[in-house]
């Protein structure tokens, strides 16, 4: 039986650990930790992003995260811990499950960029 998108997000949420904005702030700048903003460029331009985060729209993630793809991102493929976020958490959950399937061992879901901001995190303007 086909799954709904809501079911897919719930399944991904169950496998990708969540981190709070406060926990994410403590991770920023640590060796091997990479933040990935999965929002579209216009969304990032409107609100900024976590300082130093890679901006990889959800639709391009597999091609940038796959070490054997034509266009892997060396910053992402070399990460020990990947912290994902988007606007509402759904894209981050699905992306986290995808990264796990690609062999990434330590993937975290910050969920919403707003969680970062509400925890006092700075927004880097692009």
Model-derived regions, located:
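Rhodanese-like catalytic fold shared by cysteine-dependent sulfurtransferases
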Residues: 1-33, 41-83, 88-126
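Active-site flanking residues adjacent to catalytic metal/cofactor-binding acidic residues
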Residues: 36
